[in-house]
């Protein structure tokens, strides 16, 4: 085979691999976020109420800030 055919096949295979990897990773992340949604203020408020605590806005803001700092 000619050199340009080998290079063309290699580039096409690389592009196909990148595209396929992107879509597989996107599908995986969408399924992951559907099963494990990120915690928002409303969910935090419900958790505190279930634990018997009275959720004040100040406590919720502190807990949200603590979770944001923990993920950094």
Swiss-Prot record:
Note the InterPro entries from the entry: UPF0154
Mostly located where?
Answer: membrane
**TM spans, by residue?**
4-24
The protein's topology relative to the membrane is:
Single-pass membrane protein
Q: Which UniProt keywords apply?
A: Cell membrane, Membrane, Transmembrane, Transmembrane helix
The family line of this record is: Belongs to the UPF0154 family.
Task: Kindly list the places in or outside the cell where this protein is found, as annotated in its UniProt entry.
Answer: Cell membrane
Lineage here is: Bacteria, Bacillati, Bacillota, Bacilli, Bacillales
What GO cellular-component annotations does this UniProt entry give? plasma membrane
Protein name listed in UniProt? UPF0154 protein BLi02038/BL02936
């Amino acid at each position: 085979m000619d050199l340009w055919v080998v290079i063309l096949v290699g580039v096409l295979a690389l592009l196909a691999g990148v595209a396929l990897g992107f879509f597989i990773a996107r599908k995986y992340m969408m399924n992951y976020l559907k099963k494990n949604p990120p915690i928002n203020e409303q969910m935090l408020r419900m958790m505190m109420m279930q634990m018997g605590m009275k959720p004040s806005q100040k406590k919720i803001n502190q807990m949200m800030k603590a979770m944001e700092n923990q993920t950094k």
